[in-house]
């Protein structure tokens, strides 16, 4: 009896080892789970469900196979794949969740999210996020031809990489006060998120009690997952 969480795989054809590792994960570890939650940035980029990238179809088939085996899969959008829509969700069998969700996991209330909304010290990113999450902006973008969307996405990624190279590590991490505020708003003692690529279990205080923030790692040379059972919450790194 276990529920699994992963995030920040950043799947792309240029990283076949990570793709292969994810396929093995779906076929082995995930098959034993009660449910799988993907907390954003499953893909390196997403320019629309109509993108004919063969990798997208391959991943949809693999996730659907997991779901058809009896393991439900849930998805929270990340900052790289926030345009994943109902079509891909239907093809993959995933259930799309809001950006914040509280789960009852074996009697333990747990708040889950991608994590980028916690990085409130990065004012530039938060301003950009507000723009691209505007429904009108998204609708307009999705009406553009695919080749134009690809160019825009490539420019945005290049700009983001350049901007991040000049930012301090602290600015790109979560804001401690924002974390506590979110946990107290939802009245939880556990928070699981990704985004920062800094896997760790942090102890803090929220709601006047001990609390825990569990941060998933990105998939690079190894995979990262959080395994929640009735008795424990584990952050686990594993070879790909």
UniProtKB/Swiss-Prot annotation:
Cofactor note (record): Binds 2 Mn(2+) ions per subunit in a binuclear metal center.
UniProt GO molecular function: manganese ion binding; UDP-2,3-diacylglucosamine hydrolase activity
Keywords, sorted A to Z: Cell inner membrane, Cell membrane, Hydrolase, Lipid A biosynthesis, Lipid biosynthesis, Lipid metabolism, Manganese, Membrane, Metal-binding
Reactions listed under catalytic activity: UDP-2-N,3-O-bis[(3R)-3-hydroxytetradecanoyl]-alpha-D-glucosamine + H2O = 2-N,3-O-bis[(3R)-3-hydroxytetradecanoyl]-alpha-D-glucosaminyl 1-phosphate + UMP + 2 H(+)
Cofactor requirements of the protein: Mn(2+)
EC number: 3.6.1.54
Pfam family, one: Metallophos
Entry binding sites for substrate: 79-80, 122, 160, 164, 167, 195
Positions that bind Mn(2+) 2: 41, 79, 114, 195
Record membrane topology: Peripheral membrane protein
CDD domains named among the record's database cross-references: MPP_YbbF-LpxH
Family matches, as InterPro entries: Calcineurin-like_PHP_ApaH, LpxH-like, Metallo-depent_PP-like, UDP-diacylglucosamine_Hdrlase
Entry superkingdom: Bacteria
An individual GO BP term: lipid A biosynthetic process
Pathway note: Glycolipid biosynthesis; lipid IV(A) biosynthesis; lipid IV(A) from (3R)-3-hydroxytetradecanoyl-[acyl-carrier-protein] and UDP-N-acetyl-alpha-D-glucosamine: step 4/6
Compartmental location: Cell inner membrane
GO cellular component, one term: cytoplasm
Principal place of residence: membrane
Binding annotation for Mn(2+) 1: 8, 10, 41, 197
Family: Belongs to the LpxH family.
Functional note: Hydrolyzes the pyrophosphate bond of UDP-2,3-diacylglucosamine to yield 2,3-diacylglucosamine 1-phosphate (lipid X) and UMP by catalyzing the attack of water at the alpha-P atom. Involved in the biosynthesis of lipid A, a phosphorylated glycolipid that anchors the lipopolysaccharide to the outer membrane of the cell.
Protein name as catalogued: UDP-2,3-diacylglucosamine hydrolase
Organism: Salmonella arizonae (strain ATCC BAA-731 / CDC346-86 / RSK2980)
């Amino acid at each position: 009896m276990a529920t699994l969480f992963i995030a920040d795989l950043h799947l792309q054809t240029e990283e076949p080892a990570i793709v292969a590792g994810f396929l093995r994960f779906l076929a082995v570890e995930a098959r034993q789970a009660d449910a799988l939650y993907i907390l954003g940035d499953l893909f390196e980029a997403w320019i629309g469900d109509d993108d004919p990238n063969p990798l997208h179809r391959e991943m949809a088939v693999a996730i659907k196979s997991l779901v058809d085996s009896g393991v439900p899969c849930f998805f929270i959008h990340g900052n790289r794949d926030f345009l994943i829509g109902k079509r891909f969700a239907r093809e993959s069998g995933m259930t799309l969740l809001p950006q914040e969700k509280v789960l009852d996991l074996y009697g333990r209330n747990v708040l889950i999210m991608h994590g980028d909304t916690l990085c409130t010290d990065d004012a530039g990113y938060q301003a950009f996020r507000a723009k691209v999450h505007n429904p009108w902006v998204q609708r307009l973008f999705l009406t553009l031809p695919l080749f134009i969307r690809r160019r825009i996405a490539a420019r945005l990624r290049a700009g983001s990489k350049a901007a991040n190279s000049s930012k301090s590590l602290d600015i790109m991490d979560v804001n401690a006060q924002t974390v506590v505020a979110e946990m107290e708003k939802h009245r939880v003692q556990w928070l699981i998120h990704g985004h920062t690529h800094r896997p760790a279990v942090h102890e803090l205080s929220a709601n006047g009690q001990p609390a825990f923030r569990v941060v998933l790692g990105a998939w690079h040379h190894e995979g990262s997952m959080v395994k929640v059972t009735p008795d424990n919450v584990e952050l686990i790194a594993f070879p790909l």
